[in-house]
A protein has these predicted regions:
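Multi-bladed beta-propeller domains
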Residues: 1-11, 44-63, 90-106, 133-135, ...
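Residue-level detector of Asp-centered blade-edge/turn motifs that repeat once per structural unit
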Residues: 19-20, 69-70, 114-115, 196-197, ...
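Predominantly five- to eight-bladed beta-propeller fold
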Residues: 39-41, 124-173, 217, 266, ...
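Active-site-proximal cap/loop segments of hydrolase catalytic domains
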Residues: 452-641
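Hydrophobic beta-strand positions that form the internal "hydrophobic ladder"
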Residues: 24, 71-74, 119-120, 201-202, ...
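Cap/lid segment of the alpha/beta-hydrolase catalytic domain
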Residues: 376-494, 501, 533-535, 539
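Short, solvent-exposed loop/turn segments at conserved positions within beta-propeller repeat blades
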Residues: 34-39, 80-85, 158-164, 211-217, ...
């Protein structure tokens, strides 16, 4: 795979089924390198495979399709030239889409009412005079912002305290219906879910007194026509994905303990009227239902007997059906692959599933029989030679097992080797097509990557093993994995580089400050100094106390910048100018420290980008980044290097 092969990627998402399970709609995203933008259309296909998929819409970027419960209508989000996704609806049998509402900042998510007549959705409501609400006042001439809270901005979104997300309801069938704002107040609201009778909406919000000082949120229920909201969960949890049981008596949701430090996300339930305490259904030693692990919406699908949701397990994301009485779950889709999105209707399970050689295909299960209905990955497969992942297990010095993978180029080695470290730290590498690894393998480098302690998908003790001790057990695990990989004679142990982004950037800088075994390093969007990160990052105010502690000496001891005087390895630092997660000062401080000591170092800055450059940045910037990375490895890991 080469950098410009990004244009050949097709990424399906958000499958939705008609109630009889016969027809499926799915969004398919793609990159247009000539226009330097992302595009997407909706496709329709019969679930019995009797006809090939056909493109159903032709908007600039159409995403998140959802059939109405009666199957007559298809709602979706369409982004026009202003990049603001707006809610649209069209007849399932065709016709022109109709926009239901227009919001200056677009619509974020939505849900059909049970009777197929209304749609609840979430949209940010900007303060008057900001974000284009006054056409005579451009952004640079807006009044100053007065900040009084910890939580006032989010990477890749921007300032949030002056554009709160609220829940609205709109008549989906009336021509000129006016949306009704259901929620009010200086709070964030999201993830609306309808009660079975269509009278109420459950949603997620944080309205408790200390909401600015913690990550706690609750499930609330309010009349769909507007009115006072009732909190039904009064817990110390961060909640998401509420869904009513069919009888309306119970609300199911996922939640994680609010310190968020290596904690798996669990499945919970609570009486819908708030009369009882929430109860946990699943075990943090066995499951993790974090919706962030998928690429899309990942709802909870609740019926009389079970809740269908995903779980992360050793790099795989499986789709399971959990009995509401607490029995053993049934696996609907498993194996060494990743379930991104899913839907269930009419006895059919539909999902977008990826694996190491495919960015995603639509898979259906009917009567226990699995069938793949699409071949979206064929375009990339024809243009690029994709390489398989070989599973690897290593043993750390203390006996802990470390799980990972090797990807090797075609041909015979020994190949120069790149050790990759993921972000998070409570994240994971897994069984899916990873464009970065494929590009490096395509350029002739073996890639080693894995999930050291601190990663997700291996139980809570594994995830929390590094709390208060960054750079110790995790670095031992990473190096143990590299040592195990280098036992393969196809990998050249004398030509090894290391790279990673975010927490992976932290680990990259940490490693070159503690060993000289690497020829070169690439540290991207890194956290290098937790003392300044605590104040400059959008999450620093809670991340550092929860993950690194409050003792200043210990915080500095866990900061790679503390050991900059030990670094002699050539380093390429890559950062985005608008990164609010790991702000640019994290790269600048390291750059200056190394320049002052005459260490070979370069700083590559991307204008207009945030923390998500490698995943959703401007396509031309993603290609430029790939080219810079390959140039750096060519200079430092080449056979004559």
């Amino acid at each position: 795979m080469q950098p410009r092969d990004l244009a050949h990627l097709r990424t399906p998402s958000a499958p939705t089924l008609t109630p009889d399970g016969r027809l499926l709609a799915v969004a398919v995203g793609r990159i247009d390198l000539e226009a330097d933008e992302y595009r997407g259309e909706l496709w329709l296909l019969p679930t019995d495979g009797s006809a090939p998929p056909r493109r159903f819409t032709s908007g600039r970027r159409d995403v998140r399709p959802r059939f109405s419960p009666d199957g007559r209508w298809l709602a979706f989000l369409r982004a026009g030239d202003d990049d603001k996704p707006q809610l649209h609806v069209m007849a399932t049998d065709g016709g022109e889409p109709r926009r239901l509402a227009e919001h200056p900042l677009g619509v974020e998510s939505f849900a059909w009412s049970p009777d197929s007549t209304r749609i609840a959705y979430v949209a940010r409501v900007p303060q008057e005079g900001r974000y284009g609400t006054n056409k005579d006042v451009p952004p640079e001439k807006e009044p100053p912002r007065r900040i009084t809270t910890f939580q006032y901005r989010v990477d890749n979104i921007g300032f949030t305290f002056d554009r709160r997300p609220h829940v609205f309801v709109v008549d989906a069938l009336a021509e000129d219906a006016e949306p009704v704002q259901v929620t009010r107040g200086d709070y964030d609201h999201g993830e609306p879910a309808w009660s079975p009778d269509g009278a109420s909406l459950a949603f997620v919000s944080a309205r408790h007194e200390t909401r600015d000082e913690d990550a706690i949120s609750d499930v609330f229920v309010a009349p769909a026509a507007g009115g006072d909201a009732v909190r039904v969960t009064a817990t110390d949890l961060a909640v998401a994905r509420p869904a009513f049981s069919p009888d309306g008596a119970t609300i199911w949701f996922v939640a994680v303990e609010p310190d968020l430090a290596g904690r798996p996300t669990m499945l919970w339930s609570v009486p819908a009227d708030g009369s009882g305490k929430p109860e946990r259904l699943t075990d943090p030693e066995r499951y993790d239902h974090d919706p962030a692990f998928g690429a899309g919406i990942l709802p909870l699908l609740v019926d009389e007997d079970a809740v269908t949701t995903i779980t992360l397990d050793r790099g795989a994301i499986r789709l399971l059906r959990f009995p509401v009485d607490g029995g053993e779950p049934a696996e609907l889709l498993g194996g060494q692959r990743t379930v991104h999105d899913y839907a269930v209707a009419g006895g059919v399970v539909a999902a977008v599933v990826s694996h190491p050689l495919s960015a995603g295909e639509v898979v259906v299960v009917r009567d226990g029989q699995e069938r793949t209905l699409t071949d979206f990955g064929s375009l990339l497969a024809r243009s690029a030679s994709l390489r398989p992942m070989e599973e690897l297990e290593a043993t750390a010095p203390d006996g802990a097992k470390v799980h990972g993978w090797i990807l090797k180029p075609a041909g015979t080695g020994p190949f120069p080797t790149v050790l990759m470290v993921h972000g998070g730290p409570f994240a994971h590498y897994g069984w899916t097509l990873f464009d970065e690894a494929q590009v490096y393998v395509g350029a002739g480098y073996a890639v080693v990557m894995g999930n050291p302690r601190g990663s997700a998908g291996y139980g809570e003790p594994h995830g929390r093993a590094i709390v208060g001790d960054f750079g110790n057990l995790d670095s031992q695990d990473v190096l143990a994995l590299l040592d195990a990989a280098l036992e393969d004679p196809d990998l050249d142990g004398d030509r090894v580089g290391v790279m990673g982004g975010s927490y992976g950037g932290f680990m990259t800088t940490w490693l070159v400050g503690h060993t000289d075994r690497f020829r070169a390093a690439i540290s991207e969007r890194a956290c290098n100094a937790f003392d300044s990160f605590e104040g400059s990052s959008d999450i620093g105010w809670f991340f550092v106390p929860k993950y690194n502690g409050t003792d200043r000496d210990r915080v500095l001891a866990q900061s790679p910048l503390t050991y900059a005087d030990r670094i002699g390895t050539p380093m390429l630092l890559i950062h985005s100018e608008q990164d609010w997660r790991c702000p640019i000062e994290q790269a600048q401080r390291l750059f200056v420290a190394l320049k002052q000591r005459k260490v070979e170092v370069e700083l590559l800055l991307f204008p207009g980008e945030g923390h998500e450059l490698t995943r959703s940045g401007l396509p031309s910037h993603r290609v430029a980044r790939f080219e810079a990375v390959l140039d750096w490895w060519r200079r430092h890991l080449s056979p004559a290097g």
